[in-house]
Amino acid sequence: MQWDTQVTLDGCEHLVTQAYCSALPVNYSLPLQLWERFARLILEAAYEATLAAAVLNASKSGNKSVYLTLLGGGAFCNDQVWILDAIRRATKLYAGFDLVVKIVSFDHSKPAIRKLCEEI
């Protein structure tokens, strides 16, 4: 976690809190299905920890916004279903904290991501 750090864009003076997370790289060896349970566990832990930090940040700053990316969906080849399931699980765990969860996706929003946003 990087708490209360500056944004590195010209003219931005607000502070943000960043969670540095990663997913398991499942594309380098063994069949993908052998990695699934472990990869899902890593994704669940990353999103749960991020939302836990968002709750702490909201209690300190009053800002309830949290922006999530799709961890491991690129070069690491984590299945989109695993990623979305992990986000869904974490948002259910923290549903009582009124966080404003936003999904940031590369290029354009996919139908599955739009559907998830409607659910959460």
Language model features: what each stretch is:
Residues 1-66, 71-120:
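Macrodomain-like recognition of ADP-ribose-binding/processing modules
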